[in-house]
Design a protein with these regions (language model features):
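Short, acidic/hydrophobic/Gly-rich beta-strand patch recurrent on exposed beta strands
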Residues: 44-47
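Acidic, metal-coordinating catalytic segment for phosphate/diphosphate chemistry
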Residues: 1-32
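Unchanged
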Residues: 58-185
């Protein structure tokens, strides 16, 4: 154990657990959990090629921000323009110095921000990418968003070769539709963050 400041850290254990991954072996995709709170519905897609229901998501463009990727991919795959939600998302992101409370000398930043309202991502799903022909570990970042499920989606927004059908389903039915447990968990996290931020879901 080595002492660094006030902390004792096992540098050998850190070294053993640390891994380097070249950029071409790291897959980053982004998507949204888009909810119509008035009608308690969530936007999903039916992937005709894979024959499964999924959340809308997709790969980043070069130098594109992750946040922009999530909104773009949602629109491309569904035709719906989602509006991102500012929520009390528990996050390890830090406040900039100018936004820190003036609590005097010795104030330590919290490890987790619990109640700060932001448009941070709500969670991730991670897995080895089975569709990649070379080694790739994929992480999908999700943001909470909203949209009117009765609005008319834009046409011809999907990329060539995509064959996806957008669907609005009742939030109560996500476990009947979504193929992956991790995506079910993401939807539940979005609902939880919305409720703890004061949003009413399914209440006229």
């Amino acid at each position: 154990m080595e002492r660094h400041g006030e902390e004792q850290l096992d540098m050998d254990q850190i070294d053993l657990s640390m891994r380097f991954n070249p950029a071409h072996e790291v897959g980053i995709s982004c998507g949204t959990v888009t909810i119509d709170p008035k009608r308690a519905k969530v936007l999903i897609i039916w992937n005709i090629r894979l024959q499964i229901h999924q959340l809308p998501k997709g790969r980043r463009n070069v130098e594109e921000s992750w946040f922009d990727t999530a909104l773009r991919e949602t629109h491309e795959e569904t035709g719906f323009a989602a509006t991102p939600l500012a929520l009390r998302v528990p996050t390890r992101a830090q406040l900039p110095k100018r936004a820190l409370p003036n609590k005097g000398k010795g104030y330590k930043k919290p490890e987790i921000l619990w109640d700060h309202v932001s448009r941070e991502f709500i969670g991730t799903c991670s897995y080895p990418d089975p569709q990649s022909k070379s080694p790739c570990f994929k992480t999908v970042y999700f943001w909470a968003a909203t949209c009117d499920s009765t609005s008319t989606p834009d046409k011809d927004t999907q990329d060539e070769g995509e064959n996806l059908i957008p669907k609005w389903i009742d939030l109560a039915d996500i476990e009947k539709f979504l193929r992956f447990e991790a995506e079910i968990a993401v939807v539940k996290k979005a609902v939880s963050d919305m409720k703890r931020s004061g949003h009413k879901i399914g209440e006229q």
